[in-house]
């Protein structure tokens, strides 16, 4: 769900950059030192999974994994998503630098929605609600990222 360069107005770009910067800063503050390797591994998975495109009609689709990142990392998903999108912009020209904030905000807010919905349904217990919570969390991440895009 990369937004192309030149499509959005300056106020939208600035708002997206502010939301992304706040999310990245708060995510860096919230991440625990023992989760750095997990965040790096999940960031690499997010980066690679989004490069595998499946043709569908005249377009294509790819895995997003922002819901998974949100459920596992919580707020730390924001900086992970930012780094992955930055690398995609630098290496493959997906998205761009001016829309990096908006792309990070839409993906990061979707990840946070998945985090909130998953833990609201599943709570702290490990029972049958986990399957429903996982589905709802992942579905909401894609839905909210799509709506925000």
Where are these regions (language model features)?
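Alpha-helix C-terminal capping segments
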Residues: 69-76
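Interfacial aromatic-anchored transmembrane helix boundaries in multi-pass membrane proteins
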Residues: 51-59, 83-114
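Aromatic-anchored segments of alpha-helical transmembrane domains
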Residues: 45-51, 86-92, 142-148
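Short helix-perturbing small/polar motifs within transmembrane alpha-helices
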Residues: 104-149
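Hydrophobic transmembrane alpha-helices
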Residues: 2-68
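Hydrophobic alpha-helical transmembrane segments
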Residues: 9, 13-14, 36-41, 47-57, 64, 77-86, 118-132, ...
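Membrane-helix interfacial "entry" motifs
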Residues: 2-6, 31, 35, 63, ...
């Amino acid at each position: 769900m990369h937004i192309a360069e030149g499509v959005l107005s300056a106020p939208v770009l600035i708002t997206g950059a502010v939301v992304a910067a706040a999310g990245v800063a708060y995510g860096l503050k919230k991440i625990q030192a023992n989760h750095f390797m997990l965040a790096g591994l999940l960031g690499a998975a997010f980066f690679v999974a989004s490069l595998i495109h499946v043709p569908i009609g005249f377009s294509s689709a790819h895995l997003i994994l922002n819901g998974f990142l949100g459920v596992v990392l919580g707020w730390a998903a924001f900086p992970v998503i930012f780094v992955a999108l930055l690398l995609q912009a630098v290496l493959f020209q997906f998205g761009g630098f001016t829309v990096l904030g908006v792309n990070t905000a839409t993906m990061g807010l979707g990840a946070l929605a998945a985090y909130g919905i998953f833990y609201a349904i599943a709570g702290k217990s490990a029972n049958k609600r986990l399957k429903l919570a996982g589905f709802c969390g992942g579905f909401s991440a894609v839905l909210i990222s799509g709506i925000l895009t």
